[in-house]
A protein has these predicted regions:
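Ligand-binding loop in jelly-roll beta-barrel domains
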Residues: 74-93
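Short histidine-centered beta-strand/loop micro-motifs
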Residues: 18, 35-39, 56, 62-63, ...
């Protein structure tokens, strides 16, 4: 287990998404690919479409997809593997 915990809530309520103002967050899109990533800031994202696996350095792979509200902590180093084209709203804290 790594010291950086990825948190995920599957299919949060529409009320929660409204309170977070997810619809006003920028959108990120990416085609099928694999790449290393380091989070300099905490990122919260809501997946609109697609499927991907994130493997933290020294940790176990986790799969995410449509309807997931995910928080990636600042300092996390990982590898992204996009299995189906991804579209997500995101916010950096």
């Amino acid at each position: 287990m790594t010291e950086f915990e990825i948190r995920c809530e599957h299919k949060p309520s529409p009320a929660k998404l409204e309170v977070l103002q997810v619809d006003h967050w920028p959108v990120w899109k990416k085609e099928i690919s694999r790449f290393p990533w380091h989070y300099d800031q905490t990122e919260t994202c809501y997946v609109l479409r697609g499927r991907f696996v994130v493997t933290p350095e020294g940790g176990e792979p986790r799969e995410f997809g449509r309807g997931d509200l995910i928080s990636f902590p600042a300092g996390l180093a990982c590898t992204w593997e996009i299995l189906e084209p991804v579209e997500k709203h995101y916010r950096l804290d």
